[in-house]
Regions:
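Core Rossmann-like FAD-binding/catalytic domain of the broad FAD-dependent monooxygenase superfamily
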Residues: 1-168
């Protein structure tokens, strides 16, 4: 569960991200800016997901750091984390990059970084191909270059996620 909050008063909250490694229900509190924070709370199999999105259960977790007078819930949403790594990123005139080619759990913060690296590796190749300086085979090398990197980060993110989600 993620909960985005807007604050009137943030005196008791730090300007950095905090991980609470609770054995039963880990919580991450992310610094967004001076007036906003995101809370990420693990949903347990025994939890009623529909009930969890209501404000009363949410405030139960938020009350550890804030109260209703100092903050407003702007958004709450259930997320599922998973890993996806496509086997083929290039076919005919279609080239995959970023989340369409690979999806990483958020535990290392490398998902968008990997997408940016994909685009950087692809941009000069596409320019060369468009100007007839590179062949379609040269475009295909893009996956061979990027695949080992994203594969390693996805595996590492999944392992870090196991530690953070099951600290006991």
């Amino acid at each position: 569960l993620i909960v985005d909050n807007r604050y009137k008063n943030v005196k008791n909250l730090p300007d950095y991200t905090v991980q609470h490694c609770d054995k039963l229900r880990p919580v991450t509190r992310c610094y967004i800016n001076k007036k906003r924070r995101r809370w990420e709370v693990k949903i347990l199999p025994s939890d009623d997901e529909g009930e969890f999105l209501k404000s009363k259960p949410i405030w139960k977790f938020l009350s550890k750091g804030i109260d209703k007078k100092s903050a407003k819930i702007e958004r709450s949403q259930l997320y599922t984390f998973r890993s996806i790594l496509k086997k083929k990123w290039f076919k005919n005139r279609v080239i995959l990059a970023g989340d369409s080619a690979h999806l990483s759990p958020p535990f290392l913060g490398q998902g968008m970084c990997a997408g940016i690296r994909d685009v950087a590796a692809l941009a000069w190749r596409l320019k060369g191909y468009a100007s007839n300086k590179l062949s379609a085979d040269d475009l295909g090398i893009y996956q061979a270059e990027r695949f080992p990197h994203v594969s390693a980060f996805i595996k590492l993110a999944a392992e870090v996620g196991k530690i953070m989600s099951n600290p006991g």
